[in-house]
Amino acid sequence: MKMKLLGIILLVSFPFVLGFAGIPIEEGENSVEVGEVERSCINVGDFCDGKKDDCQCCRDNAFCSCSVIFGYKTNCRCEVGTTATSYGICMAKHKCGRQTTCTKPCLSKRCKKNHG
């Protein structure tokens, strides 16, 4: 009796296990396979590839920032540069092929005096 009950439990739970394991289950002719859509750029806060350039990050002043542990880049994410670095990052992104609008930061005393 125990073996019969075990067989029924396994038979009922098998589709659930396959679903959680990520194995696609085809159900007839109209089964749809969902694929990952490739994005042209990565949003701020999302993971990026530390081996690629900063063009992978969407915003004009965003760059791929990584933690370095024992010489290896890990936990790379797209981050926004500081006021001091944003303009340089934006200017470097002109090579990415996207239209970038870079506004020079107001850092000097003279600039701050004139622009509030």
UniProtKB/Swiss-Prot annotation:
Keywords: Amidation, Calcium channel impairing toxin, Disulfide bond, Ion channel impairing toxin, Knottin, Neurotoxin, Secreted, Signal, Toxin, Voltage-gated calcium channel impairing toxin. One of its GO terms (cellular component) is extracellular region. InterPro entries: Omega-agatoxin_II/III_CS, Toxin_34. PROSITE patterns: OMEGA_AGA_II_III. One of its GO terms (molecular function) is calcium channel regulator activity. Disulfide bonds join 41-58, 48-64, 55-90, 57-78, 66-76, 96-102, 106-111. Could be used as a diagnostic tool for the autoimmune disease Lambert-Eaton myasthenic syndrome. Belongs to the neurotoxin 04 (omega-agtx) family. 03 (type II/III omega-agtx) subfamily. This is Omega-ctenitoxin-Pn3a. It comes from Phoneutria nigriventer.
